[in-house]
Amino acid sequence: MSLPAETDMEDTKPSVVMVDNGDQAQFRFAEFSKNELALDEKSCKEAMDLFGETKHLLVANVLSMGNGTTEEAERNWFAFILYSIKKLAQKNEEIQKDEIENTGLTLCRILRAAKLNIAEFFKELPQFVVKAGPILSNLYGPDWENKLEAKEMHANTIHLKILSKYYKRVFEEFFVSTDANVENNSSVTNRVSEYHRFGWLLFLALRVHAFSRFKDLVTCTNGLISILAILIIHVPARFRSFNIHDSSRFVKKSANGVDLLASLCNLYNTSEDELRKTIEQANNLVADILKKKPCLASECETENLENFDRDGLTYFKDLMEESSLPSSLSVLENDYDHMTRNNGELDERLFINEDDSLLASGSLSRGSVSAGGVKRKIDLMTSPTKMITSPLSPHRSPASHANGIPSSATPMIAATPVSTAMTTAKWLRTVISPLPSKPSQELERFLTSCDKDITSDVIRRAQIILQAIFPSSPLGDRCVTGSLQSANLMDNIWAEQRRLEALKLYYRVLATMCRAEAQILGNNLTSLLTNERFHRCMLACSAELVLATHKTVTMLFPAVLERTGITAFDLSKVIESFIRYEESLPRELRRHLNSLEERLLESLVWEKGSSMYNSLAVARPALSVEINRLGLLAEPMRSLDEIAMDINFSCGGLPPVPSLPKPEPMSAQNGDPRSPKRPCTEHRNVLAERNSFTSPVKDRLLHLSNLKSKLLPPPLQSAFASPTKPNPGGGGETCAETGISVFFSKIVKLGAVRISGMVERLQLSQQIRENVYCLFQRILNQWTSLFFNRHIDQIILCCFYGVAKISQLNLTFREIIYNYRKQPQCKPEVFRSVFVDWSSARRNGSCKQRTGQEHIDIISFYNEVFIPSVKPLLVEIGPGGATTRNDRIPEANNKNDGHLAQCPGSPRISPFPSLPDMSPKKVSATHNVYVSPLRSSKMDALISHSSKSYYACVGESTHAYQSPSKDLTAINNRLNGNRKVRGPLNFDDVDVGLVSDSMVANSLYLQNGSSASSSGAPLKSEQPDS
């Protein structure tokens, strides 16, 4: 039997190579900077210096960028270099104001000159960040990534695209595009377009002046609704598409007429208090920037205000008049130019123009649980008919429209990023905000019943940690000359509101947890409630849910980890508890927590500095040498005093996501040991089942474990015990060993789901699936170091190719990558950038004589690192291998260098788990079911090849000579029929005959010819009960 051959590079990539060592590209970049962008001499020198430092990376990665051509790779690299020097060079040193104003280099200018669109730029930017990171760090300091703001820019761009579409939809719901009374509608269309543009520019002014730092999706939506209210009362009535007398949209009325703001809040799930504050700020902008005189609407007589309740409304008499509209547009344009001239970001005005080349087709979300959670393809898999049915929402949603047409009979609306965010924000507003901002009496009883009263400690910790996550800055700190002085005040109000929401949620869930733990341990919860890590994890989780609700741009996960001093492995210990103990948590937030756990398991816990390595070094001592050599151990957790000092020091101006200094060794506090080694868990079997509640892949993994123990769950405090402490559950294990076993079981389950998805896409046999899964498990247990600093999908992809080669399948790496791109969790950097430490690779059999660390493509990783390490395992899996003969890991294979290291009595390699199918959606009998055609582009993502036969698509008949409408009618008749499916059998009816077992057996015998059983076993009739 032959070993798996190394893959040929030419069958996986285009045969295009760089014809020089980068010198010609450097010359072309110089010409591009001078001729296309007209850079000044200083900026041009900075750009050329950075290009010179990174040109070797361009040469090495041409084939992995875009379509693999030199031209496209260069255009992307040029844009990355220029964007970097714009964002980093100016922040790295003090530059005179006149020098800044002369640069005029914006991302839009860069992209247009490079002939790239926004989607292309953000698709390839992460690869540049990974490859050029060390160089950028040397040139611009260790916090270069925070200064670059690439993730924030990406999330902001996604939000703007969503908001522009949302604004267009709501605008068209209230205003017509043509006038039926005018023969030539071209001028009318232009006028409406100007009103539409005016609203967007006023919204951007609101973002710049009032929402300065925290441009979250919920706040921006409130801003758009406030702009809509201004347009409704100012745009001439002849352009309205609604009739205020019969429109179902204006449901809030008083004796004085329609309450406009209350009706809009009811329509779009916004807070009336927040909307009134925002519209007041918008009115101030109109007065200050456009120099319009505000008037009380109650004192104005105009057609636009008829039948509206005018109390609390402000009116500007000539705001939308034909004579003043062009000048108002010009003033708003100039104000935006002045306020955003030097930030180097995108020109947000372009989002109003869908035909702009920069908005060319392409997904801004990079195929995963994307930035800020805006686009989650996995949600479509778990809920193809995802609808908003929150019990907090009114019984009838007046915002239910089809193609902009109001429908009072439709109780649900299809979920969009904006509607989902607003519904989730309503939960915070109505369920969490009314709670007290201090521990409840019940929680106080638990806190005071500890060995000492820790109430003041809990309150102080919460204040410090939440201040670190939601920092405030002094009034006027971020105000620019000529801007309104309300921006910073708005930031502080926003931060204070978010702190309160997170604090109240923390106290609420903590009280519920204590109540549940007390049932297991009694009332003495000292060990849990005095654990510093536990409380920080709870606060971080509370804050993350608040951030996820508001869809913030400037504090993207894992910002909460950095600011609280915990690691991804720490946070994973409380995710399940939040889902379990906060029963009112909206579905979207449950999914968010599940998606976080997926991210933690797939890559974050494997990164350098993860506390998982501290537990792994205790559980698997043979791996400690490699862990220490690579410097993977987590630093001790920072003290509260250190965090508090950082807050005070940073009050003069806090960057969006500051990098916390490396922790220094600290003494133990609150029972938390000085050692950073991760806490672990007890009661191994029960906890494995309990932890599976928060599955890695949202709802699909909620039932992965077949263990349904009836025992009480283990106490939560055991999850935060010292790693070296013996496991009270017995078996001679330490808590670290138990915790790592539970962690590995989660990794295996996540791997099983992803392997199954790839097998479906590639249409491979079940035997291949079993072999890939078996290899993945063996690598995790015997060659754990292959996962260090890597993404688990990188190992899975290599497993597929290795098994394909050993099984002599005609499957190329190109095919594997092509199908992986269609997976919901796909990120291009997974197969483009794999971490390699060459000293480790040489010890594992690599023939490369390189030194140091770098990131290479996955094919090079397969050839140089993966195959030399796992050849023995592949031989066992191949035909005639030892896997089928012995499924216990041989202890004789253990080495002292940390590889093939396994504890005595290693677990058996389990067969592929039984993954549950997608459960059907439960629909209330009082609601209709709405269906729409499924586009072919989405069908591939939702339905695998082997399961397409299970689905009936709208437009295809399920019976001969039937139309789709008749099929749907038949379905409705069955759902709504009054026939009882279940009921008692009537044995009293004289016409009912009893059928004996022998009669059934004889019938089956006759139908099958000679045997009633396919297996040849005789039928055994049951004897009647006596």
Curated annotation (Swiss-Prot):
According to the UniProt entry, its GO molecular function terms are: RNA polymerase II transcription regulatory region sequence-specific DNA binding
Q: Where in this protein does the record put region Domain B?
A: 738-872
The similarity annotation says:
Belongs to the retinoblastoma protein (RB) family.
Question: Which SUPFAM superfamilies does the UniProt entry name for this protein?
Answer: Cyclin-like
Region listing for Domain A, in residue ranges: 416-616
Q: Where is this region: Disordered?
A: 656-680, 1007-1026
Spell out the residue ranges making up region: Pocket.
416-872
Q: Where in the cell is it found?
A: Nucleus
What does the UniProt keyword field contain? Cell cycle, Nucleus, Repressor, Transcription, Transcription regulation
Spans annotated as Spacer: 617-737
Function recorded in the entry: Regulator of biological processes that recruits a histone deacetylase to control gene transcription. May play a role in the entry into mitosis, negatively regulating the cell proliferation. Formation of stable complexes with geminiviridae replication-associated proteins may create a cellular environment which favors viral DNA replication.
Q: What is this protein called?
A: Retinoblastoma-related protein 1
* SS bond partners: none
GO biological process entries? cell differentiation; negative regulation of G1/S transition of mitotic cell cycle; regulation of transcription by RNA polymerase II
Q: Which organism is it from?
A: Pisum sativum
Name any GO cellular component annotation. Answer: transcription regulator complex
